[in-house]
Swiss-Prot record:
The gene is P4HTM. It is linked to Hypotonia, hyperventilation, impaired intellectual development, dysautonomia, epilepsy, and eye abnormalities: An autosomal recessive neurodevelopmental disorder characterized by global developmental delay, poor or absent speech, hypotonia, variable ocular movement and visual abnormalities, and respiratory difficulties. Disease onset is in infancy and death due to respiratory insufficiency may occur. The keyword Metal-binding applies. This is Transmembrane prolyl 4-hydroxylase. Glycosylated. Ca(2+) 1 binds at D198, N200, D202, H204, E209. Keywords: Calcium, Dioxygenase, Disease variant, Endoplasmic reticulum, Epilepsy, Glycoprotein, Intellectual disability, Iron, Membrane, Metal-binding, Oxidoreductase, Repeat, Signal-anchor, Transmembrane, Transmembrane helix, Vitamin C. Homodimer. Its main location: endoplasmic reticulum. GO terms for molecular function: 2-oxoglutarate-dependent dioxygenase activity; calcium ion binding; hypoxia-inducible factor-proline dioxygenase activity; iron ion binding; L-ascorbic acid binding; procollagen-proline 4-dioxygenase activity. Glycans are attached at N348, N368, N382.
């Protein structure tokens, strides 16, 4: 079993409990189960998706979009899209509109979600016919689990071999081709941007306020030192105190900032992530072991086959010595201004923002790492979450090269072990709600040897209707396209620009 090193006060680890296969089943009603006291014992291993407890700040999202350089569309077109897509609930669409409509939108049932019970809780499940597996709860915030021996050593070696045969490319997060146009159409004033960054409302931008919101630029990990170097290069901080007043910020030309970021050539150690990756298809026509692993994930999650099978292909990642991935979340918040990468085929292309919508992450460790390479969850099981608290004095908990040992929970890589967690909070109606801030995680610095992992991301659109339309369209392509238009082709197109949100 992979060791999980924990710092800070954590719930007491319970003794291992063997039980029959858990009752994974869709929930009926959150309030009814709460009244009955379910979710506190062995008889209720599955809970319905309930009211979200956290909020992903819209202000943070807006600032993040500025500095991650995502494409910004025309606001008027956006409003028209939202109006005509969702309609006006207070008005009658009229008989002609109803007659010409496509009919009732397809709907999907509630999503299942494994109950954590308590940290250290174990349960026995049978995912394959010849052996049992044990699921251990590692944290409740985020809801995080570990399964030793999910993959055999032979399966791990096969995945690595297939990835090497296909070829790996350098992993990086870079600006989109529409970056210059995005900046020219930005409708946010300098004053509004200053107010969004000024978290403590003191009229000055401290370094940690800027760092908390501008996590990367051109794939370059921002540090206090790099921020001050940038200030000096673009003459944004005349007095050199590292603090920007409103006047100093107003005098700064944001185009100079982006020119500087674009021209900076960062070393590997300065990047947001330092790794190589490739994608392996798991559907019809793939290696039988790859298909078997996807079926095992399907049995583990108890989600519908359509959701699991139409999710992203398996991502295989190699971290060499010195490799790392600074702390991030796997999913981005979804507002009316955004679409999910996987359902954009059925969404209106005029929506300006695109993000990854990953309901679950299932991560496999494919080898034993000689030194370092842990997966860190910096704020796991914290009582509260505050973006600004991630940076205190000279410690940035998101920095996995320097401060992995400060994180609340670290999982040591062990060949064949899987860890999985939920990236979204429940919405109270059986679907996904806000992004779970506690799912913040990263890959610690590999100090010796090489680290191999694989990610199975389970994609769900927060819009239940859009997810249903996506599944319907993929089914139509499979029926009508024959061998030339199978879901593999559709998925390759849908995930051509797949990214991890920071």
């Amino acid at each position: 079993m992979a060791a999980a090193a924990v710092t800070g006060q954590r719930p007491e680890t319970a003794a291992a409990e063997e039980a029959s296969r858990p009752q994974w089943a869709p929930p009926d009603h959150c309030q009814a189960q709460a009244a009955a006291g379910l979710g506190d014992g062995e008889d209720a291993p599955v809970r319905p998706l309930c009211k979200p407890r956290g909020i992903c700040s819209r202000a943070y999202f807006l600032v993040l979009m500025v500095f991650v350089h995502l494409y910004l569309g025309n606001v008027l077109a956006l409003l028209l899209f939202v109006h005509y897509s969702n309609g006006d609930e207070s008005s009658d669409p009229g008989p002609q509109h109803r007659a010409q409509g496509p009919g009732p939108e397809p709907t999907l049932g509630p999503l299942t979600r494994l109950e954590g019970i308590k940290v250290g809780h174990e349960r026995k499940v049978q995912l394959v016919t010849d052996r049992d597996h044990f699921i251990r709860t590692l944290s409740l915030k985020p809801l995080l689990f570990e399964i030793p021996g999910f993959l055999t050593d032979e399966e791990c070696r096969l995945i690595i071999h297939l990835a090497q045969m296909k070829g790996l490319q350098r992993s990086q997060i870079l600006p989109t081709e529409e970056y210059e146009e995005a900046m020219s159409t930005m409708q946010v004033s300098q004053l509004d941007l200053f107010r969004l960054l000024d978290q403590n409302r003191d009229g000055h931008l401290q370094l940690r306020e800027v760092l908390a919101q501008t996590r990367l630029g051109n794939g370059w990990w921002m540090t206090p030192e790099s921020i001050q170097e940038m200030y000096a290069a673009i003459k944004a901080d005349p007095d050199g105190d590292g603090v920007l007043s409103l006047q100093e910020f107003s005098n700064m030309d944001l185009r100079d900032f982006h020119k500087y970021m674009r021209s900076h050539k960062a070393e590997s150690s300065e990047l947001v992530r330092n790794s190589h990756h490739t994608w392996l298809y798991q559907g019809e026509g793939a290696h039988h072991i790859m298909r078997a692993i996807r079926q095992r994930v399907l049995r583990l999650t108890r989600l519908s086959p359509e959701i699991v099978e139409l999710s992203e292909p398996l991502q295989v990642v190699r971290y060499g010595e010195g490799g790392h991935y600074h702390a991030h979340v796997d999913s981005g918040p979804v507002y009316p201004e955004t679409i999910c990468s996987h359902t954009k085929l059925v969404a209106n292309e005029s929506v300006p923002f695109e993000t990854s919508c990953r309901y679950m992450t299932v991560l496999f460790y494919l080898n034993n790492v000689t030194g370092g390479g842990e997966t860190v969850f910096p704020v796991a099981d914290n009582r509260t979450y505050d973006e600004m608290s991630l940076i205190q004095d000279d410690v940035d908990l998101r920095d996995t090269r320097r401060h992995c040992d400060k994180g609340n929970l670290r999982v040591k890589p062990q060949q064949g072990t899987a860890v999985f967690w939920y990236n979204y909070l429940p919405d109270g109606q059986g679907w996904v709600g806000d992004v779970d801030d506690y799912s913040l995680h990263g890959g610690c610095l590999v100090t010796r040897g090489t680290k191999w992992i694989a990610n199975n991301w389970i994609n769900v659109d927060p819009s239940r209707a859009r997810q249903a339309l996506f599944q319907q369209e993929m089914a139509r392509l499979a029926r009508e396209g024959g061998t030339d238009s199978q879901p593999e082709w559709a998925l390759d197109r849908a995930y051509r620009d797949a990214r991890v949100e920071l």
